């Protein structure tokens, strides 16, 4: 269809023009036939001419000309069928032949009815009916519309004018609910369309007076009938668009009831009135009444001011909840909440108050309410505090009352977890005194004050304390210069820590906190000699008690003691720095030759003292001691010596020699060690001689000549000396190598020489001429030259140089000549290209002759030219042009000469052979030339145009060409070349011209012409005379040649061939030169094809033909365009091809075919139109989309182009249902269909006058069932029923579905598939199922209705195998097998069997099948019942019962115990009463009692140890370490009395009571009741048993019992007085004997010391304090060992620790002098003193380690190290000091020589800023030399408390023989003291021992700290002791330390280290015991020990 008429006309016109034929043919024709329809026409005509070309042109008043391509029917008949015409339109048809013949015809097309005619149901009402239609295609004058009733009688008729959009008409005043038929006909002019009929109905009237009666699960509906026709009513109850119930009722009914509805739910009720296929409705929102909430609970969740309200949402819907809170009828708060909220909270309430909560469920305007009560938690008391200042056994608590409501307070006192008091006080109380409870001093108790309100309570806790007691036996343990140690015993009761303070007068110096386990403390950093007050305060919380003591530190020794003689021979002066701290005075001693010369006391303000009248040169010692408070400090010693006297009469003589001096003197008076004679010069000693004091002369040789020597004779005595001085000089030496130089000067001579050796004063230089003196100069000795000026040029002189030293001198001579002067006024007189002429004036002074030289580049041009001394000019000839020469004139005098010079330049020559060329360039000229003769510096080349300089350039001399750029094209230039040499120039000229420029912008254009081309260009640059234009063919053959003047810009070539390619060239001409050609190419336009036509077409195919084009062409391009002008397809064909076909085109589409003729890049085209046949639609599908009265048909659009679709729907019986025409649709909905019915649809595709169709089927969805319900719901089955759809609908069956998809069995109990019910089997118990039912329509092709759904849950099964059993006395455990059901959990209740009181009730998760029920009453029967719950379904109950176990009796409170005031005592017994009420029988009846007895001591416990059984009386009597025992068990008779609480029984403890075990028999190991000790404090507890023996009277291993608190101490009576007196007498006798023995030994010791010590001498070599030792029982010999059995060690250690470690300190004092009598002479040698770190820690000579001597040095074998024996070898260890920087090599040498494999280091290199040991090993893995040994670290393992390193060591002489050494470095030993715990060091020692045992061939193990005695001795002793523990049944710590001190001084240096060894042994033994009890042999012995922490209280060096 050609819709774009105007555009198409233009295309056709162009086509006609382009395809016009060459010859005209006359074609007459006759019209044969013409036919029209609505959209097309058919016209035929006949002609007898041939061939003819016709065109059919037609048009209307609404469209322009359109064309129809005629076809030849036969040889003479033509026809054309115009399509796509407009219906109802008048067309003018014109048939035209190409020769001008034509004919005209007028035809009108038929009008079309409306495309869509329908009843507008939206505008149709009860009394009106509106129809509407779309405009007909084409032209319509009006529409005729008729209305018929159901009897086919015409009722109304109307004419409606044409409209551009929808047209409509409404019929009025019709009857409600009646059926009608409407017809419509389109009219256009005289023509009418066929009529179209539709059916319609008016809408029936709705019901009236709709009424509702709501209930929670039902609604009652009532109404009144409306007017008009009614067939039936349909009642639809909907919920949010979903139908809940849908039912039809008879038209006579006026009410209906809906049941099984949701409470409180809002429904949409619609009552539909149905008549004539239409319906009208009235709807109303209706609501069921809501239900009240369930499980309403009001809880406080432990909160004070809020209540949480929770409830379960009621069935159905709730819009909101109205919640009110009230108290005693008054509403306090109300709120409204919306679901799904099922809880809320009321805040800001009064604590402890009872409230009423009411919840109203509101659904719309309806509501239902429910109430419950709840109480808030009472508030805690506020400001709860305890108060105590002075009470040690009581305190008071105060509080502020809480806010809100409460009833009373409960006061509970706790001792940790033990309740001491539980009482109730009134609400008006605000304090409570906790007294009369015998609380323990210093203990912290916890007090809980509980506020009770109803059954709720709230509590607040605080802590209260009793005041602690002060420490006991506080005393000063030790003191030194800066520290003061105190010790004490722990107080009674409890405390948390100690506060240690130290007062210096009124100033607090130290204030520190210590742990409660501390028993001593050392104050450090104190002032020496000062008196301090130390205070120890016991702290318990913020309460305290203090105890104080005074002590004084040892005064400090003075420092920096110096003794100085101040250069005096008979006096010594001493000074020192005052000692720190407090000093009373200083004691100063002067000692000479071990004799005290003076003993003076000086004031503390003095720090110096002097000694007079001393012997010269003597050595004295000064000793200074500080004294403060009667205590002396350590002594400080310094030495000093007086100065010796000097000699006299010193004489010196050189004997006339320059290298010799002799010295003599008189002997000095006094003591002299020797003389020292020295020769010095300028303060530096050149030679010295040591002369014996008996000799008084000496001589020196090999001295320096001329030197003045200072001669010193020194008298030496010790380090001091006296001196005598004089001086003398040696004879000086001569100078050497005199040199005289004129320095190239004419009036000057310089004299130089080599300095004379030795010393001298200066030089004298004299110059002469022929023996006549001229000048003498004095030259300093530092210089070796001098100058003489104003001499005669060229003259010879004599020079003399003399050396002067004091009164001595020596001389040497030499000669020299001055330089002559040069000539004057040397001038270049004349020059040419080859000549130079010079002149000069004569020189001054003496001249022998002149010499003239000519040089070029410093090379001589001619031989030397000699002239007489009178010559003044010379001329050089035959020289080179332009060359630069140098002319020299020399003045000669003797062998010396002087020169003058001048430079000369010859004139340069011009260049030759100039050539100028443009080389085809338009803007440049190239100039070349040949050089002239001689030298040039450069060339200057210039270009001139018309005598104006254009360019000028300087060219290097080696260049011979130059190019001028940026010149004008085609112009003439003059070129000038200048030769330059120095300042001289020469020039030559020449002429040249540039090439003309080519034209630009050459273009060849065809102006779309087929036979001409025009070439154009732009003017050429520069100078041009004319242009030559050449025309050439494509192969370059010249076709034409023309010339144009310089002003021309284009030229046109005519008569060319179409489509042919040409070339054009243009040349610029100037001065006979041609430019480079400029070229362009052009082509004429090719001709288009003619006679273009369509030869064949089909639905996917089009074929075209044409006549070939004239001229030249390359190919054809053929294009096929879509209607939207997009390219569909293209092809390129050969020029000989005259037809082409297109395949696979789009159906029904109108295409445009264009053929383009190509020649080169030019083309010409022709075109024509053609259409393909349309296609049918695809994938036609019908769908009901879950609707019952509609079908949707959808399809894929038809391929290609089309005009519209025609849709025809048929009923199952073949009758047509509906007919529609649409274009752009792919889906159509048919409405008003029967539910479940099958329909057939035809879809016809139209494109132009062509069409195609396809068929599809569809079935509507059947109506759904309704009223789904469940019945007979059991565990595994149920019945389900529903109501089916109406009978007038189509359906076949029902389908039942469910979720979850279990394998169920569905049974239909009826024979018909349409039956409305099924029975379901195989359900899972307790599972929730969702069932849905659908209606099925059809058999093979089924459709389904919307499902109706319902939920149901089966009942869960009950649990299996419930079994309950007791767990303990207050708990039972129940287990069961869960049911094979779906369930949420269990509902569990536990009741007492006797009272049916619920003790336990809870919901339990489904995952659990085991439950522990606790907090029950012991020994009661309980019934446990369990139900399985699954949502709202509950299983059958399952029950089981059991009895709880018996438990230990409840713990009696602290006040329930034996009262010490209610007892009768004797010396061996205690009589008291026990009441049955002391123990409750709630945990079981008390079966037995026992009495527990304990001796009272300071460490008393509150209750007996939880141990069964306790020791018996016999064990207590025979083992002093046992302090507690029990009696035999006796049966309880408390349960025999109805009122057992008042029953009591008497106990007489210690009276051999039968019930307590009776009299004790040592032969029987049983519990008994023996007599108590006289005058002994006992504490008594009663132990009650609820379970002790089984039925066979066998005792349980773990019986159940409880104890009362121990009574307060009850002391038995004393023995008679006679026994006491006897004991006292015996004690006094023993004391007297002991005093006598002590006196005897003291006297004996004093006598021994008086014999050994001289009275007049003081030794300062070794300071050993005196000590007296008493060793009773040893017969005067010191003990060497003290082995202790392992099983007795802990008791032994406790005895040593008694009385502040008194015995242990005494034992350590016994070791003080062990081994000290041995000699240390080798260590004291002066050569070895520097190798000792400390001067008081020296190795004994007998046990020291010796190194191999080096170079026969007897002291090279010394190192401060000692052999120490072990348990296995005599030399098992080497104890040594930490290496010094100078002894590191010796240390490793010792390790190498002693075959050491293991080194133990127990110190840090630096501790507290002080160097303790040098870092003597490599810091990384790089090897280092230590002497001759090479050491390399192999590995390093760093652990938290020690580090293990491995070293590889070898000798430099034996590199292959290396050895591995392990280095064990313990890093946590504190600077002063011992490690904090024993565990760490024990583990370290065992680690080292393990490595030692794995090195069987190794030598001794080296152990060192800093000094090698304290920590070293502790380590060695501990290693030996641990080995004893592993191999023996005894341990000997004393013997081990004694043995160590025999081999090295001070081993185990401090008492705290000695104590620490005992603690290690104790902890190891404890660990062994614990390991044995745990029966775990792998348990480490150093673990699971509760180690005590230790700190050394004594500063020590180790």
Swiss-Prot record:
Expression is very high in the vasculature of lung, spleen, and kidney, as well as in the heart valves, and is also present in the endothelium of arterioles and venules. Also expressed in tumor vasculature. The chain crosses the membrane at residues 1623-1643. Residues 23-1622 are extracellular. Residues 1-22 form the signal peptide. It catalyses: O-phospho-L-tyrosyl-[protein] + H2O = L-tyrosyl-[protein] + phosphate. Its EC number is 3.1.3.48. One of its GO terms (biological process) is dephosphorylation. Residues 1704-1964 form the Tyrosine-protein phosphatase domain. Residues 1644-1997 are cytoplasmic. PROSITE patterns: FN3 (PS50853), TYR_PHOSPHATASE_1 (PS00383), TYR_PHOSPHATASE_2 (PS50056), TYR_PHOSPHATASE_PTP (PS50055). The modification Phosphotyrosine is found at residue 1982. Residues 23-109, 113-206, 207-291, 292-384, 378-466, 470-556, 557-642, 643-733, 734-821, 822-913, 908-994, 995-1088, 1086-1173, 1176-1263, 1264-1357, 1358-1449, 1449-1551 form the Fibronectin type-III domain. It is a single-pass type I membrane protein. SMART domains: FN3 (SM00060), PTPc (SM00194), PTPc_motif (SM00404). Glycans are attached at residues 28, 53, 75, 173, 199, 268, 415, 422, 480, 575, 599, 653, 830, 1041, 1097, 1164, 1186, 1213, 1275, 1368, 1471, 1475, 1519. The keyword Transport does not apply. Monomer. Interacts with TEK. Interacts via fibronectin type-III 17 domain with CDH5. Detected in a complex with CNTN1 and NRCAM. Interacts (phosphorylated form) with FYN and GRB2. Interacts with IGFBP2. PANTHER family: CYTOKINE RECEPTOR, RECEPTOR-TYPE TYROSINE-PROTEIN PHOSPHATASE BETA. This is Receptor-type tyrosine-protein phosphatase beta. It comes from Mus musculus.
């Amino acid at each position: 269809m050609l819709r774009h008429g105007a555009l198409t006309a233009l295309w056709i016109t162009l086509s006609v023009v382009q395809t016009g034929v060459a010859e005209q043919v006359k074609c007459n024709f006759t019209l044969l036939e013409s036919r029209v329809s609505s959209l097309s026409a058919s016209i035929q005509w006949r002609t007898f001419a041939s061939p003819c070309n016709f065109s059919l042109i037609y048009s209307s008043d609404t469209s322009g000309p359109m064309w129809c391509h005629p076809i030849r029917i036969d040889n003479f008949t033509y026809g054309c069928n115009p399509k796509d015409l407009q219906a109802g339109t008048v067309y003018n048809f014109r048939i035209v032949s190409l020769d001008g013949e034509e004919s005209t015809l007028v035809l009108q097309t038929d009008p079309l009815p409306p495309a869509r005619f329908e009843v507008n149901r939206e505008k149709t009402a009860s009394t009106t009916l509106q129809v509407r239609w779309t405009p007909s295609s084409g032209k319509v004058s009006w529409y005729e519309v008729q209305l018929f009733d159901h009897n086919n009688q015409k009722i109304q008729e109307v004419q409606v004018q044409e409209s551009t959009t929808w047209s409509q008409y409404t019929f009025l005043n019709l009857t409600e609910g009646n059926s009608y038929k409407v017809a419509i006909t389109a009219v256009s002019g005289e023509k009418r369309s066929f009529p179209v009929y539709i059916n319609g109905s008016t809408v029936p009237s709705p019901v009236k007076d709709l009424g509702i009666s709501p209930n929670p699960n039902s609604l009652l509906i009532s109404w009144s009938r409306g007017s008009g026709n009614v067939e039936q009513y349909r009642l639809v109850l909907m919920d949010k668009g979903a139908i809940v119930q849908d039912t039809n009722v008879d038209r006579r009914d006026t009410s209906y009831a809906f049941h099984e509805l949701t409470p409180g739910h809002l429904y949409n009720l619609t009552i539909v009135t149905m008549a004539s296929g239409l319906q009208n409705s009235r709807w109303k929102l209706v609501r069921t009444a809501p239900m009240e909430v369930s499980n309403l609970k009001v809880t406080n969740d432990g909160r004070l001011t809020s209540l949480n309200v929770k409830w379960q949402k009621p069935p159905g819907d709730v819009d909101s909840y109205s919640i009110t809170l009230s108290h005693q009828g008054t509403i306090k708060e109300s709120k409204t909440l919306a679901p799904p909220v099922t809880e809320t909270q009321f805040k800001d309430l009064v604590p402890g108050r009872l409230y009423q909560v009411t919840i109203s469920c509101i659904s719309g305007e309806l509501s239902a309410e429910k109430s419950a009560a709840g109480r808030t938690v009472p508030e805690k008391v506020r400001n709860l505090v305890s108060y105590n200042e002075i009470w040690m056994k009581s305190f008071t608590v105060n509080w502020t009352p809480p806010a809100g409501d409460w009833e009373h307070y409960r006061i509970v006192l706790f001792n940790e977890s033990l309740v001491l008091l539980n009482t109730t006080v009134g609400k008006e109380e605000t304090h409570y005194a906790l007294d009369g409870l015998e609380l323990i001093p210093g203990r912290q108790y916890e007090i809980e004050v509980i506020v009770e309100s109803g059954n709720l309570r709230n509590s607040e806790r605080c802590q209260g304390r009793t005041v602690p007691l002060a420490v006991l036996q506080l005393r000063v343990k030790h003191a030194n210069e800066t520290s003061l140690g105190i010790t004490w015993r722990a107080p009674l009761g409890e405390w948390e820590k100690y506060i240690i303070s130290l007062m210096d007068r009124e100033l607090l110096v130290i204030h520190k906190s210590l742990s409660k386990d501390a028993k001593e403390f050392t104050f450090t950093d104190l002032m020496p000699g000062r008196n301090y007050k130390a205070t120890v305060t016991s702290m318990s919380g913020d309460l305290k008690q203090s105890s104080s003591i005074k002590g004084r530190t040892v005064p400090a020794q003075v420092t920096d003691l110096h003794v100085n003689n101040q250069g005096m021979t008979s006096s010594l002066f001493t000074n020192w720095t005052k000692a720190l701290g407090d000093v009373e005075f200083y004691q100063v001693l002067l000692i000479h030759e071990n004799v005290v010369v003076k003993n003076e006391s000086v004031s503390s303000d003095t720090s110096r003292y002097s000694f007079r009248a001393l012997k010269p040169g003597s050595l004295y010692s000064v000793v200074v001691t500080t004294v403060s408070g009667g205590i002396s400090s350590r002594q400080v010693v310094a030495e000093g010596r007086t100065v010796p006297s000097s000699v006299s009469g010193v004489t010196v003589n050189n004997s006339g020699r320059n290298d010799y001096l002799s010295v003599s003197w008189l002997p000095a008076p006094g003591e002299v060690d020797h003389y020292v004679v020295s020769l010095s010069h300028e303060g530096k000693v050149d030679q010295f001689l040591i002369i014996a004091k008996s000799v008084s002369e000496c001589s020196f040789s090999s001295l320096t000549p001329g030197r003045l020597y200072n001669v010193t004779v020194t008298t030496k005595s010790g380090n001091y000396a006296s001196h005598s001085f004089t001086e003398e000089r040696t004879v000086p030496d001569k100078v050497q190598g005199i040199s005289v130089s004129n320095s190239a000067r004419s009036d000057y001579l310089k004299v130089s020489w080599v300095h004379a050796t030795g010393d001298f004063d200066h030089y004298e230089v004299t110059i002469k001429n022929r023996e006549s003196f001229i000048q003498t100069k004095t030259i300093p000795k530092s210089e070796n030259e001098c100058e003489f000026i104003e001499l005669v040029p060229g003259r010879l002189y004599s020079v003399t140089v003399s050396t002067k030293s004091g009164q001595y001198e020596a001389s040497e001579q030499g000669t020299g000549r001055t330089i002559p002067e040069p000539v004057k006024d040397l001038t270049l007189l004349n020059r040419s290209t080859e000549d130079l002429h010079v002149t000069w004036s004569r020189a001054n002074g003496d001249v022998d002759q002149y010499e003239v030289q000519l040089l070029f580049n410093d090379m001589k041009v001619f031989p030397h030219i000699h002239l007489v001394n009178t010559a003044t000019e010379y001329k050089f000839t035959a020289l080179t042009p332009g060359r630069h020469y140098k002319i020299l004139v020399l003045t000669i005098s003797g062998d010396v000469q002087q020169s003058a010079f001048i430079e000369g330049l010859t004139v340069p020559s011009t260049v030759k052979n100039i050539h100028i060329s443009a080389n085809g360039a338009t803007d440049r000229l190239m100039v070349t030339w040949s050089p002239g003769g001689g030298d040039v510096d450069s060339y200057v080349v210039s270009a001139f145009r018309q005598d104006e300089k254009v360019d000028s350039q300087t060219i290097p001399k080696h260049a011979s060409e130059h190019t001028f750029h940026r010149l004008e094209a085609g112009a003439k230039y003059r070129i000038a070349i200048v030769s330059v040499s120095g300042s001289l120039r020469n020039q030559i000229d020449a002429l040249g011209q540039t090439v003309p420029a080519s034209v630009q912008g050459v273009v060849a254009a065809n102006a779309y012409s087929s036979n001409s081309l025009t070439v154009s260009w732009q003017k050429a640059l520069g100078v041009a005379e004319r242009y030559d234009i050449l025309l050439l063919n494509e192969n370059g053959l010249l076709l034409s040649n023309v010339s144009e003047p310089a002003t021309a810009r284009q030229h046109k070539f005519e008569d060319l061939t179409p489509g042919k390619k040409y070339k054009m060239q243009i040349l610029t001409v100037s001065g006979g030169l041609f430019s480079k050609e400029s070229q362009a190419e052009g082509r004429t336009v090719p001709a288009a094809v003619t006679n273009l036509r369509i030869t064949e077409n089909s639905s996917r195919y089009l074929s075209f033909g044409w006549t070939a084009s004239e001229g030249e062409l390359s190919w054809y391009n053929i294009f096929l365009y879509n209607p939207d002008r997009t390219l569909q397809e293209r092809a390129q064909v050969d020029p000989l091809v005259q037809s082409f076909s297109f395949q696979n085109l789009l159906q029904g589409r109108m295409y445009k075919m264009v053929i383009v003729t190509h020649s080169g890049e030019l083309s010409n085209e022709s075109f024509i139109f053609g259409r393909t046949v349309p296609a049918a639609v695809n994938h036609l599908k019908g769908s009901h989309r879950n609707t019952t009265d509609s079908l949707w048909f959808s399809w894929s659009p038809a391929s290609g182009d089309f005009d519209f679709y025609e849709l025809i729907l048929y009923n199952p019986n073949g009758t047509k249902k509906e007919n529609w025409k649409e274009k752009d649709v792919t889906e159509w909905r048919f409405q008003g269909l029967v539910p479940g019915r099958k329909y057939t649809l035809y879809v016809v595709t139209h494109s132009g006058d062509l069409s195609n169709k396809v068929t599809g089927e569809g079935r509507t969805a059947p109506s759904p069932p309704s009223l789904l319900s469940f019945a007979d719901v059991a565990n595994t089955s149920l019945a389900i029923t529903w109501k089916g759809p109406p009978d007038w609908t189509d359906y076949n069956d029902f389908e039942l579905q469910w979720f979850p998809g279990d394998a169920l069995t569905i049974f239909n109990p009826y024979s018909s598939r349409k039956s409305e019910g099924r029975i379901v089997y195989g359900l899972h118990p307790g599972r929730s199922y969702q069932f849905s039912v659908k209606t099925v329509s059809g058999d093979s092709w089924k459709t389904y209705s919307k499902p109706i759904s319902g939920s149901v849950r089966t009942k869960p099964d009950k649990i299996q195998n419930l079994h309950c059993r007791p767990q303990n006395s207050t708990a039972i455990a129940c287990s069961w097998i869960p049911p094979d059901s779906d369930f949420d959990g269990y509902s569990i209740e536990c009741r007492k069997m006797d009272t049916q009181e619920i003790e336990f009730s809870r919901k339990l998760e489904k995952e659990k099948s085991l439950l522990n029920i606790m907090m029950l009453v012991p020994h009661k029967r309980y019934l446990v019942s369990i139900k399985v719950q699954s949502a709202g379904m509950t299983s059958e109950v399952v029950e089981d019962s059991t009895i709880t176990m018996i438990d230990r009796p409840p713990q009696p409170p602290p006040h329930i115990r034996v009262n010490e005031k209610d007892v009768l005592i004797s010396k061996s017994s205690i009589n008291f009463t026990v009441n049955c009420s002391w123990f409750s029988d709630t945990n079981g009846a008390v079966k037995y009692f026992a009495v527990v007895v304990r001796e009272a001591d300071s460490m008393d416990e509150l209750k007996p140890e939880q141990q069964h059984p306790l020791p018996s009386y016999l064990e207590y009597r025979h083992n002093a370490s046992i302090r507690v025992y029990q009696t035999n068990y006796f049966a309880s008779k408390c349960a025999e009395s109805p009122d057992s609480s008042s029953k009591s029984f008497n106990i007489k403890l210690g009276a051999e009571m039968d019930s307590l075990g009776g009299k004790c028999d040592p032969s029987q190991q049983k519990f008994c009741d023996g007599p108590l000790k006289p005058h002994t404090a006992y504490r008594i507890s009663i132990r009650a048993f609820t379970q002790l023996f089984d039925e066979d009277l066998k005792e349980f291993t773990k019986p159940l019992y409880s104890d009362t608190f121990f009574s307060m101490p009850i002391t038995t009576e004393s023995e008679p007085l006679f026994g006491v007196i006897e004991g006292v007498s015996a004690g006094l006798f023993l004391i007297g004997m002991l005093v006598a023995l002590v006196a005897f030994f003291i006297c004996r010791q004093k006598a021994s010391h008086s014999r050994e010590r001289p009275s007049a001498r003081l030794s300062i070599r070794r300071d050993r304090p005196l000590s007296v030792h008493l060793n009773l029982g040893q017969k005067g010999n010191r003990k060497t060992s003290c082995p202790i059995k392992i099983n007795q060690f802990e008791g032994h250690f406790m005895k040593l620790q008694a009385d502040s470690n008194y015995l242990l300190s005494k034992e350590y004092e016994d070791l003080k002098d062990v081994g000290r009598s041995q000699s240390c002479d080798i260590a004291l040698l002066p050569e070895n003193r520097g190798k000792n770190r400390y001067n008081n820690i020296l190795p004994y000579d007998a046990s020291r380690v010796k190194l191999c001597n080096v170079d026969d040095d007897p002291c090279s074998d010394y190192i401060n190290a000692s052999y120490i024996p072990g348990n296995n070898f005599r030399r098992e260890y080497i104890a040594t000091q930490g290496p010094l920087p100078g002894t590191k090599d010796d240390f490793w040498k010792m390790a190498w020589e002693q075959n050491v494999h293991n080194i133990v280091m127990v110190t840090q290199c630096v501790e507290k800023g002080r160097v303790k040991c040098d870092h003597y090993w490599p810091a990384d893995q790089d090897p280092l030399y230590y002497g001759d040994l090479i050491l390399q670290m192999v590995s390093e393992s760093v652990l938290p408390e020690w580090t293990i390193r491995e070293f590889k060591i070898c000798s430099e002489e034996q590199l292959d023989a290396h050895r591995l050494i392990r280095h064990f470095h313990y890093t946590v030993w504190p600077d002063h003291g011992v490690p904090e715990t024993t565990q760490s060091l024990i583990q370290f020692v065992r680690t080292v021992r393990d490595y030692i045992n794995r090195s069987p061939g190794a030598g001794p193990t080296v152990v060192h700290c800093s000094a090698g005695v304290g920590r070293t001795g502790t380590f060695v002793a501990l290693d030996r002791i641990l080995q004893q523990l592993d191999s023996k049944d005894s341990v000997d710590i004393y013997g081990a330390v004694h043995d160590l001190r025999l081999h090295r001084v001070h081993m185990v240096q401090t008492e705290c280290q000695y104590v620490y060894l005992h603690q290690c042994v104790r902890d190891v033994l404890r660990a062994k015991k614990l390991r044995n009890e745990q029966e775990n042999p792998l348990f480490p012995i150093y673990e699971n020990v509760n180690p005590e922490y230790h700190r050394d209280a004594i500063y020590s060096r180790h």
